[in-house]
Amino acid sequence: MQRPQLSVVIPCYNEAACLELLHARVGAAARGAVGDDYEIVFINDGSRDDSWAVMQRLAAGDPHLVAINLSRNHGHQLALTAGLDLCAGEQVLIIDADLQDPPELLTDMRATMREQEADVVYAVRRRREGETLFKKMTAAGFYRILDRVTDTPIPLDTGDFRLMSRRALDAFLSLPEQARFIRGMVAWIGFRQVPFLYDRAERHAGTTKYPLRKMIAFALD
């Protein structure tokens, strides 16, 4: 089976209010980048709202959309891993469901990958709109501490928003770790990895899925 040029993988937890606009914007960005040769993979991570019902409705009207329903809430990193394991694209864009990371940057990220002959283009947050000073300070401190205690340097001010080649994704998927820290694991696999600066938008709807207590638990794992 021929692979699509692009997969867009999006883990979702209680994001029903974002999904229709997310689907429309991601679909438009994908078509602008690769025409009709793409897939969108939504992973419902045990949501308690109407996320799964919305996904099913959207998938019924869009052959490009694959909707995966996990049996319970497994957490963002495992949900994302499930989507990465099932996606088929030659390039894979990872993006969150809250629309803080603009899918419209896809074309420029692909151009960066091509021009710099990179296997990973990771998005670096230049500005973070709509976040409290406390959130910005705790996030900055958390990732700087995490960077100091890990063996592999992890780019600062990044999330999981990134574009990966198929060979980089296959290398990531070969790693056996059960406790998944995806941005750290991607940094570890090697290949040429380059930054892409962007301004992070406000969340479209809902609340953050990474409050301080979850960040602490994440670090302890």
Model-predicted regions and their roles:
Residues 66-86, 103-185, 201-220:
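Acceptor/aglycone-binding surface of glycosyltransferases and processive sugar-polymer synthases
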Residues 191-193:
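Histidine/lysine/aspartate-rich catalytic loop segments that bind and position anionic ligands
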